[in-house]
Regions:
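Short beta-strand immediately N-terminal to the catalytic nucleophile in serine-hydrolase-like folds
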Residues: 44-46, 74
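Generic alpha-helical structural signal
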Residues: 23, 27-30, 55, 120, ...
């Protein structure tokens, strides 16, 4: 038996309060997940910025001795590379979009549907997420929960080639690469789903 819990960033027009830090979102979701059936194996998954939220939830659960079967990070930026990410998002909107198109870093299908104002809001949120990542404090010790790290073969070399740095934050890490860039979740979702299901089946 399986249950899926998901969290989506605030969108234009919804009335939710914006959470400005990884810790705020992690605390909110951790409290919700504690209400889940304890008999159901729990896996935490994050993409890009949400990888840090997944880590924060996992950290909180380990501190309270609540078991998690595994954590899955897709396109996660290791903590020591956060300044590089901040440098990228310090560009103006047009420069950021041009660079993204060349590197397949952002969701171009979504961006194409947005007005100029909505594009600015979208990029502003990405910048705020990046600031939240830079400000987040990781533990000095390694988490016990096994990590499955997944990146695209065409992702930013700085991210793709430094996934081994997650070994500094988890006792056990398995590394995987799939076709595509940073947004492989939109173009290679079938391959991604197969890899994730295989990982889950190995850890239940």
């Amino acid at each position: 038996m399986e249950k899926l819990f998901s969290w989506e960033s605030k969108k234009k027009g919804d009335g939710r309060e914006i959470k400005s830090s990884v810790e705020e979102v992690g605390a909110l979701l951790a409290n919700e997940l504690k209400e889940a059936d304890k008999e159901i194996p729990l896996f935490i998954m994050g993409y890009s910025y949400s990888c840090y939220i997944a880590y924060d939830i996992c950290k909180r659960f380990e501190q309270e001795n609540i078991p998690i079967q595994g954590i899955i990070m897709i396109g996660g930026t290791p903590p020591t590379l956060r300044d590089d990410l901040m440098q990228f998002f310090s560009n103006d909107d047009n420069a950021l979009l041009d660079y993204s198109r060349a590197k397949d870093l952002l969701n171009e299908e979504l961006i194409a549907t947005l007005s100029d104002e909505e594009k600015h809001e979208y990029l502003h949120e990405l910048r705020m997420n990046t600031v939240a990542m830079v400000n987040y404090k990781f533990l000095d010790c390694k988490l016990k929960t096994p990590l499955c790290s997944i990146v695209g073969r065409e992702d930013e070399p700085t991210i793709r080639n430094n996934q081994h740095l997650w070994n500094n934050y988890f006792q056990k890490v398995s590394f995987h690469q799939l076709p595509g860039g940073h947004v492989l979740i939109t173009k290679y979702h079938a391959e991604l789903a197969k890899l994730i299901m295989n990982y889950i089946e190995l850890h239940v």
